[in-house]
Amino acid sequence: LGGMQNLMWGLSNSLSKHFMIKVFADFHKDHKNYDNSVSFSVERIGGFKLFKKYRKAYLVNEFIKKNKNIEGVIADHWKSIELIKTNKKKICLIHSKEINHDKGTNLNKRVLKVLNNVDHIVSNSKYTKDLAITLGVISNKISVINPGIDPVKNLDETSLKDAEKLLKGKKTRLITVSRYDKRKNHEKVIMALRNLKQIYPDIVYICV
């Protein structure tokens, strides 16, 4: 799972303590055990990616029609809410990569048509908020909420000792938190370490 998926899980989990929550999510082969363990309802949508967007929008729209007491819709991507037809409150999360289309292009116009017509936009960082504003998104719709984490109740003693051993005497620490995915560009960070080492001889790079 990526950062946005984890963020949506955290939102769903927290909101389910106060509201009835229905989640429409992509199909995953091991979804049953997970879906049965959470405190909210999950409906999975499979099939080809090209058609999945339209099928998901249809299912969401039908669910809204049948459930008049719905208070709002939260989407993880502007494309996820593009085809949702409702006058209920709409909230859309944004991430820089997903909205970064040159101003005036067709994609940029689609992004603005969606985002400037939702009630609230949640940006995962100030950087993303500033980028959205420069691309034409209405600034007073945007709030910045940095992704949170679940506190760890018990830390493994072996892991703690390994971390202390690794970090001992290393005042300069470079840390990246992400999946080991090519598009995350870990290799560029590793390539930069040679130059950083000359400035910070004790630097240590940790990938989490």
Question: Language-model segments: which ranges?
Answer:
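A short, basic/aromatic alpha-helical/loop segment that forms part
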Residues: 1, 181-186, 199
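N-terminal strand-loop element at the rim of the active site
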Residues: 1, 6-52
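Carbohydrate-associated surface elements
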Residues: 27, 127, 148
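A short, histidine- and acid-enriched strand-loop-helix "catalytic/donor-clamping" loop
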Residues: 51, 80-82, 91-106, 117-120
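A short beta-strand/loop micro-motif in the catalytic core of glycosyltransferases
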Residues: 73-74, 117-125
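Short His-centered aromatic/hydrophobic patch
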Residues: 74-80
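Acidic anion/phosphate-binding donor-loop and adjacent secondary structure
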Residues: 102-105, 133, 148-165
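Conserved donor-binding/catalytic core segment of Leloir-type glycosyltransferases
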Residues: 166-184, 190-193, 206
